[in-house]
């Protein structure tokens, strides 16, 4: 099911991007969250 994986990855990336955009002053927390996701 490549399509479902692509959709899941898109949702994760969009959520991470929104978190980084809304909390741009918390860089360390964002980096930890990104590392957990695997980015």
From Swiss-Prot:
It is found in: Secreted; Cytoplasm. The keyword Calcium does not apply. Transmembrane segments: none annotated. Its main location: secreted. Belongs to the Phr family. The gene is phrI. Keywords: Cytoplasm, Secreted. Contains a predicted signal peptide cleavage site in the N-terminal region, however the propeptide is probably subject to only one processing event, at the N-terminal end of the mature peptide. Encoded by the mobile genetic element ICEBs1. Intercellular signaling molecule that inhibits excision of the mobile genetic element ICEBs1 when cells are crowded by cells that contain ICEBs1 and produce the PhrI peptide. Secreted during production, but the mature peptide acts intracellularly, indicating that it needs to be imported into the cell to function. Acts by inhibiting RapI activity. Residues 1-34 form a propeptide. Disulfide bonds: none annotated. GO terms for cellular component: cytoplasm; extracellular region. This is Phosphatase RapI inhibitor. Induction: Expression is stimulated by conditions of low nutrient availability and high cell density.
């Amino acid at each position: 099911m490549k399509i479902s994986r692509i959709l899941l990855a898109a949702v994760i990336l969009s959520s991470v991007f929104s978190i980084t955009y809304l909390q741009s002053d918390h860089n360390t927390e964002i980096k930890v969250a990104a590392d957990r996701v695997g980015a």
